[in-house]
Amino acid sequence: MGQKINPIGLRLGVNQTWSSRWYADSGEYGRLLHEDLKIRSYVMEELKQAAISKVIIERPHKKCRVTIHSARPGLIIGKKGADIEKLRHQLSEMTNAETSLNIVEIRKPEIDATIIAQSVAQQLERRVAFRRAMKRAVQSAMRLGAEGIRINCSGRLGGAEIARMEWYREGRVPLHTLRADVDYSTAEARTAYGVCGVKVWVFKGEILEHDPMASEHRATRNDNSSSSLNRRRESV
């Protein structure tokens, strides 16, 4: 079962938590969920070059708080904070609520599954050989501290007539072990031959305590142990 299911969904409530953190009445739930999907789609589309890993949405009373985890926070903030103010204003119009923005810098994008998947997909679109792209990503992740990584690429790889799936793995990626901190993400590469899919699993070690926020706390601790602190900006 662990081989098929989404590793993050399998570990929700164990050492992973949700990206949307709010409660709502049954009458409002559908509207707010659809709003969350629109926010994430808009942010990922508008800030493609900012290497965004995840967008966390919280909804305190009649407000909306959006936290963007990015490897390039400077592209989001802009000169003197002009770009982040524009983004905050646009999100406020989408939600019809007072919106605040937090930007969290990812210090080690080489071991973030979402950023790895996006990078491999972008290389495939630029006609880089898929084996070279996968191997480069795997080597970078292992060098930066990942205990294991697996990358799958599927589709008409290299312009082949018949679609197939190729994968590359290094280290160990325990998908059945619930205490394993496994990051997972997917991406699509729109090539001249059709769409190629990219899947990435990154094993970062084991989390022994039962804490749904444990994976996020571990990432934060790793970032704070770096030579420079995370750059954060909040606009209210």
Swiss-Prot record:
Gene3D superfamilies: 3.30.300.20, Ribosomal protein S3, C-terminal domain. Keywords: Ribonucleoprotein, Ribosomal protein, RNA-binding, rRNA-binding. Signal peptide: none annotated. GO terms for cellular component: cytosolic small ribosomal subunit. It comes from the Bacteria. Disulfide bonds: none annotated. Residues 214-236 are annotated as: Disordered. Residues 39-107 form the KH type-2 domain. GO terms for biological process: translation. One of its GO terms (molecular function) is rRNA binding. PROSITE patterns: KH_TYPE_2, RIBOSOMAL_S3. Pfam families: KH_2, Ribosomal_S3_C. Binds the lower part of the 30S subunit head. Binds mRNA in the 70S ribosome, positioning it for translation. Belongs to the universal ribosomal protein uS3 family. HAMAP family: Ribosomal_uS3_B. Part of the 30S ribosomal subunit. Forms a tight complex with proteins S10 and S14. This is Small ribosomal subunit protein uS3.
